[in-house]
Amino acid sequence: MQRLFALILAIFLWFHFAPPAQALGADLVPCSESPAFQQRAQVARNTTADPESGKKRFERYSQALCGPEGLPHLIVDGRLDHAGDFLIPSILFLYIAGWIGWVGRAYLQTIKKQGSNVEQKEIQIELPIALPIMLSGFAWPAAAIKEFLSGELTAKDEEITISPR
């Protein structure tokens, strides 16, 4: 039965009974040329106190690519001509998230070394300790590489507990 199914599948694929796959973005057009987008732009609501905010928003969106429904689409396939759509904001997000994590880790290590009232200092952050750490956090990628290469970033095998199952 499995061989029969495989034979039927091979025949269907051989004679192209499978639907053709469309290239990514093949049905996308510049929003400035999309009739559905133009209709949406005419009834754009203002989102701020600026009476022109809706119009300005749709002017910015008109540079993007729209689908047949008139909505802008992000192209996230790694092509550099669309880097401003997704690649640059995602790298910036990862940098900021890493900064926050690195600074939080450094703060916890610092208060743990001081030894007194650690749990309370986790809840109520002490600004004299936290501010210098926050300001030095911009260089977290270099500090992370340095700590990784020195072995300070990772735990030693002896420090990792093993479950006695």
Swiss-Prot record:
Record InterPro entries: PSI_PsaF, PSI_PsaF_sf
Main location: membrane
Keywords: Membrane, Photosynthesis, Photosystem I, Signal, Thylakoid, Transmembrane, Transmembrane helix
Topology in membrane: Single-pass membrane protein
Signal peptide: 1-23
Pfam families tied to this protein: PSI_PsaF (PF02507)
Subcellular location: Cellular thylakoid membrane
Residues that span the membrane, as ranges: 83-103
Keyword DNA repair appears in the UniProt entry: no
Keyword Methyltransferase part of the UniProt annotation: no
A GO biological-process term: photosynthesis
Domain of life: Bacteria
Gene Ontology CC: one annotated term: plasma membrane-derived thylakoid membrane
Function: Probably participates in efficiency of electron transfer from plastocyanin to P700 (or cytochrome c553 in algae and cyanobacteria). This plastocyanin-docking protein contributes to the specific association of plastocyanin to PSI.
Protein family: Belongs to the PsaF family.
Protein name: Photosystem I reaction center subunit III
Source species of the chain: Mastigocladus laminosus (Fischerella sp.)
Gene encoding the protein: psaF
